[in-house]
């Protein structure tokens, strides 16, 4: 069994929490995999299935909670504290502190967006990058979310439209509609399902204020700072080997993901049949095989 180590990295006077899966039988040919979670502010727990690569192939796997969430939670900050550069600079700080100078990179959702920003800035020491359901343009993401909503029952569409109008997503009707959307396109389970993944519950419990500031009140509208997200030109400069990973039932729809695949030079793409946004929650084996199959080519 992998030895799980926990540590903290100093960052801006705060502490960034890191969790490291150290293989019992490490393969020296396998470079470490650094995993970036989504949100911003969703924390690392829901991606822990990728830690299984430590036992399976002898690969070191590193997770961290980005500043402002989970075990890297901080006191309330003014909105201008939370910027893209906050997490970009943290990425390089964590790597330097942990000696991660020769790695593979994985990012889910916002984590993939963050990874793209970092690879556009400085890709030194990154051998490959798996971009898991991450948009290069937020408006495409929103247009597709609105298209997916039209396949839901009319009363649920109406409830979410009313929630968007009032800003109140806490009504029973809006909660039920959001749960249905999350079951179909995000988690793959209803909140009331006894099989709802514990790792997702733990991530939800650790969400920080940065989610509301950057994203907004829901997955269907972006009212925060990410509303102008568009890196279509920037990703053309990414030089390292990349693979997009997404699901057919993903809120990051194939149309959304293809936009990035077409722009990132020589980007490959693995599309998992029936998988939602958190594909590893419903299709863990397919995700592990896809990720290891890609990154092992660049060890």
Model segments located where?
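Conserved loop-alpha-helix segment in the C-terminal half of the alpha/beta-hydrolase fold
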Residues: 232-275
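Conserved HGGG/HGGXW glycine-rich cap/lid loop of the alpha/beta-hydrolase fold
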Residues: 14-74, 78
């Amino acid at each position: 069994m992998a030895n799980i180590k926990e540590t903290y990295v100093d960052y801006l006077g705060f502490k960034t929490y890191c969790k490291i899966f150290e293989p019992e039988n490490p393969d020296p040919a396998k470079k470490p995999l650094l995993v970036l979670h989504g949100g911003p502010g969703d924390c690392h727990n829901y991606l822990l299935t990728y830690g299984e690569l430590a036992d399976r192939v002898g690969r070191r796997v590193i997770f961290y909670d980005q500043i402002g969430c989970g075990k890297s939670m901080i006191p309330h900050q003014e909105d201008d504290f939370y910027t893209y550069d906050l997490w970009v600079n943290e990425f390089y700080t964590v790597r330097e502190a942990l000696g991660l100078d020769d790695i593979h990179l994985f990012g889910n959702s916002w984590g993939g967006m963050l990874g793209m920003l970092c690879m556009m800035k400085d890709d030194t020491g990154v051998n490959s990058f798996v971009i898991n359901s991450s948009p290069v343009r937020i408006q495409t993401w929103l247009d597709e979310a609105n298209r997916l909503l039209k396949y839901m029952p009319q009363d649920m569409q109406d409830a979410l439209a009313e929630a968007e109008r009032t800003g109140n997503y806490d009504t029973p009707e809006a909660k039920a509609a959001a749960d249905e959307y999350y079951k179909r396109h995000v988690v793959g389970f209803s909140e009331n399902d006894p099989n709802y993944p514990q790792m997702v519950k733990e991530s939800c419990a650790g969400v920080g204020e940065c989610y509301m500031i950057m994203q907004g009140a829901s997955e269907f509208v972006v009212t925060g700072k990410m509303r102008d997200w568009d890196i279509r030109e920037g990703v053309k400069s990414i030089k390292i080997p990349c693979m997009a990973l997404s699901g057919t039932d993903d809120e990051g729809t194939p149309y959304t993901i293809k936009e990035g695949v077409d722009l990132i030079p020589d980007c490959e793409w693995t599309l998992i049949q029936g998988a939602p946004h958190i594909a590893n929650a419903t299709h863990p084996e397919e995700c592990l095989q896809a990720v290891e199959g890609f990154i092992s080519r660049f060890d």
